[in-house]
Amino acid sequence: MQRDFTYVGDIVQGINIILDNTLNAIWVKQHEIYNLGTGVSNELMDYIRCLEDELGRVAQKNYLPMHPADVKSTQADISKTQKLGYEPTTSIRDGIKLFVDWHKEYYKETLISEVRHLHLVKT
């Protein structure tokens, strides 16, 4: 199975470009569709391997047959959005590393806060 995996920072960049162009009414026609993504399809298993590498753990996989309504491969057609200046730059591996680093830091702070709260509540 292949998908167009895109780092959230690249999506935010694209949204900002579309909004800027819409507000300035330079290139963007209102009510049109502007796709965001990388424009490249990648294997789901490659994505999972990158995630496993970054987490230092092997995922427990449960392989199932494809659902009849599922699509084997998808990718965004970003040609219209590229004309506005959108160009995703984050690789899958870099995006996963950025996300895992953020996730660990965010939940470390959340865990520290919860532990402090528990110590304050203790009687």
Predicted features and spans:
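C-terminal substrate-binding subdomain of Rossmann-fold SDR/epimerase-dehydratase oxidoreductases
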Residues: 1-123
